[in-house]
A protein has these predicted regions:
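Exposed, low-structure sequence patches enriched in small/polar residues
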Residues: 1-174
Length: 174
């Protein structure tokens, strides 16, 4: 008898259940260089870094056992990969949480691919962002956000819904 928790319902005409295997990896890494005692550079001590990685892949029951445990298996692009999702977020902070000024640079990337009966559905987003904040006379903050984004979608079954959009945004705030 097979545990039904390993089954995922995939909407088909006959509403059948198919066994799939899921592998995922979540990672958060954070470095505050100001905590290092032996650094003599005041500039470097004001930096902090943060990195978030999330990977999730689902494979068919025909996948080899070791590949079922591998969250990077989607890189092989085989027919056993039913879906994958990846998320990467990197941030560099300068003078983080300082009451006078701070600067933040970030990169966010997300990808997903789903295998349907009609073909693959792929989505991709990439964002670059720079944010700076300065306090003026201890009364108000001036903030500037600059971002650049690439967003795309590729659907094998319906080419009219495919797109790739590049955008740039500048947002000053007081």
């Amino acid at each position: 008898d097979v545990d039904s928790a390993q089954f995922v319902r995939i909407q088909l005409f006959n509403s059948a259940y198919y066994q799939v295997y899921q592998a995922s990896w979540n990672n958060l890494t954070s470095f505050d260089l100001g905590q290092l005692k032996n650094l003599h550079s005041k500039f470097i001590k004001k930096l902090s870094l943060e990195n978030v990685i999330r990977l999730n892949s689902k494979q068919s029951e025909n996948t080899a056992f070791l590949d079922r445990l591998n969250p990077l298996y989607f890189l092989k692009n085989g027919s056993e990969v039913l879906s994958f999702q990846s998320y990467f977020n990197q941030n560099i902070y300068f003078n983080r949480a300082n009451p006078i000024y701070d600067i933040q640079c970030s990169r966010l990337e997300s990808k997903s691919r789903f295998l349907y009966i009609s073909g693959n559905d792929e989505r991709f987003n990439l964002d670059y962002n720079i944010r700076s904040r300065a306090t003026i006379q201890k009364k108000f903050d001036v903030i500037l956000n600059i971002s650049q984004r690439v967003e795309s979608q590729l659907i094998a079954s319906y080419a009219l819904q495919n797109f790739k959009i590049n955008s740039t945004k500048v947002e000053p705030e007081i």
